[in-house]
Amino acid sequence: MPKRGKKYLEALKLVDRSKAYPIAEAIELVKKTNVAKFDATVEVAFRLGVDPKKADQQIRGAVVLPHGTGKVARVLVFAKGEKAKEAEAAGADYVGDTEYINKIQQGWFDFDVVVATPDMMGEVGKLGRILGPKGLMPDPKTGTVTFDVAKAVQEIKAGKVEYRVDKAGNIHVPIGKVSFDNEKLAENFAAVYEALIKAKPAAAKGTYVKNVTITSTMGPGIKVDPTTVAVAQ
């Protein structure tokens, strides 16, 4: 376990590790326990009762945060002709086809999200071994393989975030910055929680949401009582 600094240890004293806090209280604690000297990201981790090894219990999707993440994503779109023009008009940072495939194969990664039209996936598929491990491969489940490239770009720029269950059954999602108003962080949290409830696989048995933790960059984790979140289930 890495050695923790004095500020972190002082922040940790403010947290009751055995308690699951109401979301409003948890957000307040995240701000009080933030030890970073920059505008830290606030992230939520969900431990879900699923077996990711089973194909029918895979969870992957995307949700538009009502107040964004505090960061504007750089979007690369693989498209041709009119669709390329639509992507450019919508605000995509990079639009093209084979030239960007070649750049990525040579180690270029100045982007955060990749969108592709379905007709481009034959070519983009060549990048699977490069983009896949980085979580950047376009996927219909996240709305990043689509002919409606304008909508995809606009949603991503507005604060759309992807989520994907890892091998241990966890999902990590950024919900904003510590500088955000508490209410905005709570509403972003609720949007993510509602999306995950809707994404529950039919094959999942037992307790679905096992544990929820909210934290800031470099700050301690704070358990959240998800029943205090008002969402339409």
UniProtKB/Swiss-Prot annotation:
rRNA-binding keyword on record: yes
Gene3D superfamilies from the UniProt entry: 3.30.190.20, 3.40.50.790
GO terms, molecular function: rRNA binding; structural constituent of ribosome; tRNA binding
Signal peptide boundaries: none
InterPro entries noted in UniProt: Ribosom_uL1_bac-type (IPR005878), Ribosomal_uL1 (IPR002143), Ribosomal_uL1-like (IPR023674), Ribosomal_uL1/biogenesis (IPR028364), Ribosomal_uL1_3-a/b-sand (IPR016095), Ribosomal_uL1_CS (IPR023673)
Keyword flag Repressor: yes
Listed name of the protein: Large ribosomal subunit protein uL1
Record gene name: rplA
